[in-house]
Amino acid sequence: MEGPGQDTEDALRRSLDPEGYEDTKGSRTSLGTMSNPLVSDVDLEAAGSRQPTAHRDTYEGYVELHELVLDSRKDPCWMEAGRWLHLEESMEPGGAWGSHLPLLTYHSLLELHRAFAKGVVLLDVAANSLAAVAHVLLDQLIYEGQLKPQHRDDVLRALLLRHKHPSEAESVWTLPAAQLQCSDGEQKDADERALLRDQRAVEMRELHGAGQSPSRAQLGPQLHQQLPEDTEATLVLVACAAFLEQPLLALVRLGAPCPDAVLAVPLPVRFVLTVLGPDSPRLSYHEIRRAAATVMADRVFRRDAYLCGGRAELLGGLQGFLEASIVLPPQEVPSEQHLHALIPLQRHAVRRRYQHPDTVRSPGGPTAPKDTGDKGQAPQDDDPLLRTRRPFGGLVRDIRRRYPKYLSDIRDALNPQCLAAVIFIYFAALSPAITFGGLLGEKTRGMMGVSELLLSTSVQCLLFSLLSAQPLLVVGFSGPLLVFEEAFFRFCEDHGLEYIVGRVWIGFWLILLVLLVVACEGTVLVRYLSRYTQEIFSFLISLIFIYETFAKLVTIFEAHPLQQSYDTDVSTEPSVPKPNTALLSLVLMAGTFFLALFLRQFKNSVFLPGKVRRLIGDFGVPISIFVMALADFFIKDTYTQKLKVPRGLEVTNGTARGWFIHPMGSATPFPIWMMFASPVPALLVFILIFLETQITTLIVSKPERKLVKGSGFHLDLLLIVAMGGLAALFGMPWLSATTVRTITHANALTVVGKSAVPGERAHIVEVKEQRLSGLLVAVLIGVSILMEPILKYIPLAVLFGIFLYMGVTSLFGIQLFDRILLLLMPPKYHPKEPYVTRVKTWRITSSPLTQILVVALLWGVKVSPASLRCPFVLVLTVPLRRLLLPRIFSEIELKCLDTDDAVVTFEEAEGQDVYNEVQMPS
């Protein structure tokens, strides 16, 4: 997503450069070597020659803020008021810790900048305790004239008070703030005493040792385990001092981290930031302390603080923080939607702030840092879609890349998470196999059905798990293949050909085609399959799913029409049509669809714990089938058409075929001309398998998933197509990689790091890249062939409800469908997406208009006698996208309208759906 232009950035910089900053010019830098040598009552090490602290640019920077308060016994102490770790975290009045985005006032940032400009900056102080730091700090404040010598002991005793951490009984919300008073009896005037009447004066007593509250004992170790070993902390101390005339700030950077145990987390302290000042109505120390802690928690400023050699560099880092900040004008915000425009502006500012200083800028935007070494060439050489220009070169590279890791594929499977994934993927693969098997039997009149599809899925999944280069792929039947089977079956019926024998010859040509494509490294053509083509394909399949569901329902109503009156003579035999069948079929189909859709949406709701919701949502389809089949089972007096499943390893239609299909024909000789014409339908099948398999491999191989064993575009395609070609010889369906099931499989095997750090996104620890989960799923699906006593009770209307569910839900992740909906929305309700904000509205409608025209053309071909040619028309969308659309849209518009911006989701939050990542039909 592109950010705002340069004008916006310049305006932001000018607004953050007020005249009040001019007093920073000519200010001195105070170094640790300028400490007063009279400090002799503490253990200080020799400072030596000062060198900049080693660069520790860790992502985590822990900051803890302590305020001076009076505890329940009216004793002064330092109380933890908040902590910063990515986000600001503070204890709410109810006693619970809550994290939120730190929001700062503009005035507090100005005051902080002035304080840094005039305050004390001590760099690389050689002190091994916070007490030593306090002595050095006070001596420097007196040396620079910011603290009177008679106040030294008062401030020192305050800095050495014990530190406590909040609990339900004691926190900054329940305890009064304390104020430093001078011990020599100096008093304020009457107005100041009236102003401070609610604050108790601190009775100066030096308390050694750090207090430890229950919250520290419980939370500290838990949070510490989530942080890297090299994390260092910043301690911010804020107190109100009545004897000071103006605020003072002192920043101390230690030469070596101090291990004093005053923090809630056992971390060494590298920075100590102290803010002291008089209580004044024009100064809000609450906001200043939050601003100071937020700045110290900033990743870039922390790097500058580690590396700075003086005050000027530190102020430069603070200036960079201000330039990247956003200021809201003091006016009422009409609605929260208007605040959404801040998100891209803030992201752009953060991206520029985190940008590597060596990055080369060009008119087209930032480019990668210059690197002529070998490290930059390694990823390119390992690109699985890089041409080797040798016959079968890509296949050889896939084998050399993956097969040496075969033993690790077995070892990595010895994990409980893999067993859980097996159970989950089994049901995820079984439900569509039963659904498509029942529908395939309907479309082909029993030539292939549930038993053939289950056996084909089992055998091919087993072989693929053993031999593939990417065993995370789940092989199965899909909607596009079902559409082709129906079209080819009608073609064979119209021309008097044996459908099951024609598939054998298609299988032979499939094997030759895939060998030719793999030999020529044709799989690299997947680079040209943009979102434009994928969404046309997905939208067409979704429409076919929805249309076929209602077409089947209409057929049921025609076979069993409703009657306006019924014969009450019970002695007569009932007629063949059964009017209740149509109504019950409608109820079963609609009930299955809405129940499955509800369970999918329930997965992203806020009810029940997240694990329970995801479990229910992931098993939504089998739950829906079970519930509606159970309802049909208890309705005894109404007939519904059931799923036809043979017993054991029998074929669906034993009278028409066997397990081996003779290539020359069984009932009649197969025409020779059709043997040589079979390359045409074979090419169509190959296009469908190629599209689904290669796009699925691309999705699962995204860098965000952090797979380390590589993928195999060439080897996996060869295995899937070759196994499908051989399966046709036994009268079984050919299969392809299934997108939704593959993503589900990969997510189930992904170990996502659980972090207690507020604001930190879930990160991948590892992915269990192994072969046994797919192998066990294949075995379980094969055993499911023996489930005939259970499967025979499933009504076909229930399967058509699942068919409708797949068609409707496939539209949710298609941006083409979203753009069609934009035509019905007023512009003010349009989403803040790049293709909406960067492209004019009338041009947004032009892109889906061309896609709709192509879909209409494909639909016309589908319903015509030339329905087999649909994949050919689909392939023509590739040159259409690359040759015609650039003449209609500009380059930036095409990038917005035709980019793969699907976010990889490993753990869904409320309102998110992992299947929106998928742009292919399932």
UniProtKB/Swiss-Prot annotation:
Topological domains annotated Extracellular: 441-448, 490-498, 555-581, 635-674
Glycoprotein as UniProt keyword: yes
Cytoplasmic topological domain: 1-416, 470-472, 520-531, 603-613, 696-711, 749-771, 812-849, 881-922
Basic and acidic residues biased stretches: 10-26
Cellular location(s): Cell membrane; Basolateral cell membrane
Residue positions the entry lists as glycosylated: N653
Chemical reaction(s) catalysed: hydrogencarbonate(in) + chloride(out) = hydrogencarbonate(out) + chloride(in)
Superkingdom as given in the UniProt entry: Eukaryota
Topological category with respect to the lipid bilayer: Multi-pass membrane protein
InterPro entries per record: Anion_exchange, Anion_exchange_1, Anion_exchange_CS, Band3_cytoplasmic_dom, HCO3_transpt-like_TM_dom, HCO3_transpt_euk, PTrfase/Anion_transptr
Keyword annotations of the record: Anion exchange, Cell membrane, Glycoprotein, Ion transport, Membrane, Transmembrane, Transmembrane helix, Transport
GO annotation, biological process: bicarbonate transport; regulation of intracellular pH; transmembrane transport
Membrane is among the record's keywords: yes
Tissue expression remark: Erythrocytes.
GO cellular component, one term: plasma membrane
One term of GO molecular function: bicarbonate transmembrane transporter activity
Its biological purpose: Functions both as a transporter that mediates electroneutral anion exchange across the cell membrane and as a structural protein. Major integral membrane glycoprotein of the erythrocyte membrane; required for normal flexibility and stability of the erythrocyte membrane and for normal erythrocyte shape via the interactions of its cytoplasmic domain with cytoskeletal proteins, glycolytic enzymes, and hemoglobin. Functions as a transporter that mediates the 1:1 exchange of inorganic anions across the erythrocyte membrane.
Subunit structure: A dimer in solution, it spans the membrane asymmetrically and appears to be tetrameric.
Similarity comment: family membership: Belongs to the anion exchanger (TC 2.A.31) family.
Protein name per UniProt: Band 3 anion transport protein
Species name: Gallus gallus (Chicken)
Phylogenetic classification of the source organism: Eukaryota, Metazoa, Chordata, Craniata, Vertebrata
